[in-house]
Amino acid sequence: MIKKEIIILCGPTASGKSCLGHELAKAYDCEIINIDSMQVYKEIPIITASPIQIYNTDIHYHLYNFLSITEDFSVIKYLKLAAKKIKEITVRGKLPILIGGTGLYINLLVFGYNNIPDISEDLRVQVRNLHDKIGNIELWNQLKKLDPIASTKINHCDTQRLIRAYEVFMHTGKSIFSFHTAPKERILSDFNFKIIFLNPERKFLYKTCDERLDKIFKDKAIDEIALLKKQFTPEEYAHLKAVGIKEILAYLDGNLTLDAALNVAQMRTRQYAKRQVTWFTHQIQDKTILEYSTQEEFAQILRHLLFILRS
């Protein structure tokens, strides 16, 4: 059986993924699927630089800005939605292009995931409330009695993993690590992935990061986050990790000047981009790497990609 192909266009923030993907989609009548964990939320298209906020064309974009921040969502739910969209697009005879920089989503989509059952929102709330009441150390002590294997592998200071392990045991009666040792499930085993990694020269990347944040701050991002603050409680948007939200909230609360908020957001964006480059460099082995250090070289990338797609 000949496997169908999927293009994944990945790389650090502000590396030009959306621009290149848009041009490829126009040239080849492709459809674009989001693979960024923050661009799924409909309340924050500006601060996340959502391409459907930027491009107004007939190109089909999927899984962008479709979800409210209060809706229950998980990486497994994302994978199932993405797989459904990919299959629908290929049935129509078109090529799907996935664009984003969330390494976890890309890794699990390409290489498979441990099939841990979904945790109900009610149970998740119960465990979070328990944690808020008793704290990390006591929750870790309870986990040790229920799941001694997990307690030896999870530090009591690692709140996220601690809560997750406790949730999984309460839901399944099994250690979370029993799922880790089981064979991984590949949701798209009948597809081939062609991974293209955009890797700009560091100085050029940092420049584009700064320019993007400057543009975002001028492009009504302040109003967007002010509305978020007005419509939702801090608990409801605490899980939003997009750079710029925390800094704008500090500005709105009078704790930072606007210039200081922008400077901090730019610094954090550069740090985030550096971490993304490190992750993609070491975690994704089978990939095509496209490097550039100027706008002129960046313009040549499209021609290179068109050649790759023809090969």
UniProtKB/Swiss-Prot annotation:
Belongs to the IPP transferase family. InterPro entries: Dimethylallyltransferase, IPT, P-loop_NTPase. GO terms for molecular function: ATP binding; tRNA dimethylallyltransferase activity. One of its GO terms (biological process) is tRNA modification. Monomer. This is tRNA dimethylallyltransferase. It comes from the Bacteria. It comes from Rickettsia prowazekii (strain Madrid E). Its EC number is 2.5.1.75. Residues 36-39, 160-164 are annotated as: Interaction with substrate tRNA. Catalyzes the transfer of a dimethylallyl group onto the adenine at position 37 in tRNAs that read codons beginning with uridine, leading to the formation of N6-(dimethylallyl)adenosine (i(6)A). The gene is miaA. Its cofactor is Mg(2+). It catalyses: adenosine(37) in tRNA + dimethylallyl diphosphate = N(6)-dimethylallyladenosine(37) in tRNA + diphosphate. The keyword Cell membrane does not apply. The lineage of its organism: Bacteria, Pseudomonadati, Pseudomonadota, Alphaproteobacteria, Rickettsiales. It is an enzyme of class 2 (transferase). The keyword Lyase does not apply. Keywords: ATP-binding, Magnesium, Nucleotide-binding, Transferase, tRNA processing. SUPFAM superfamilies: P-loop containing nucleoside triphosphate hydrolases. The record marks T102, R124 as: Interaction with substrate tRNA. ATP binds at G11, P12, T13, A14, S15, G16, K17, S18. Substrate binds at T13, A14, S15, G16, K17, S18.
